[in-house]
């Protein structure tokens, strides 16, 4: 969840929905909770490491993920504002597998995304097509890639029809 920006935006613009925001950083969760309180928004924040096995039974209508996707060699391309306000583990992929978070979240969605649910990812421009292929392999449909404000392919949306 990082600073909570995505969760706050979704809650503010979808008042009657329940938002569950997860992060494995206590620091990030403290910041996100503070931001939610400042904006009078009721959000369920939980310390969850998606890469570890857990026994959550919640089924979601929508899963939104902005996992770490920047390579450490690209650190000089990241603005100082981002580097000062986000923990490095929220920004940089710390694995030899650039798709580790995407694979894990797609696998998680098989048992936690409702039939006809939607999944959204923010992606690195160099791996967005690989993420699209993972979604296709896992039987997601209606896959759309969207550009960010700089015209770079950055977001991907896909529908789940169950039994992936």
Set out the residue ranges of the language-model regions.
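Conserved SAM/SAH cofactor-binding pocket of Class I
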Residues: 1-75
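Residue-level signal for beta-strand positions within conserved beta-sheet cores that form or flank
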Residues: 15, 41, 78, 139-141, ...
């Amino acid at each position: 969840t990082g600073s909570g920006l995505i969760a706050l935006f979704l809650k503010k613009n979808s008042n009657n929905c329940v938002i569950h925001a997860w992060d494995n950083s206590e620091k990030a969760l403290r910041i996100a909770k503070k931001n939610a309180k400042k904006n009078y928004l009721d959000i369920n924040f939980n310390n969850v490491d998606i890469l570890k096995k857990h026994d959550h039974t919640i089924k979601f209508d929508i899963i939104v993920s902005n996992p770490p996707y920047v390579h450490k060699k690209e650190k000089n391309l990241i603005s100082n504002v981002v580097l000062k306000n986000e923990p490095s583990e929220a920004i940089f992929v710390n694995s030899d597998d650039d798709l580790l978070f995407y694979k894990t979240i797609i696998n998680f969605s098989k048992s936690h995304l409702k039939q006809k649910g939607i999944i959204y990812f923010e992606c690195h421009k160099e791996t967005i097509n690989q993420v699209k292929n993972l979604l296709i392999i896992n039987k997601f449909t209606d896959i759309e890639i969207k550009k960010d404000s700089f015209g770079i392919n950055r977001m991907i949306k896909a529908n789940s029809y169950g039994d992936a």
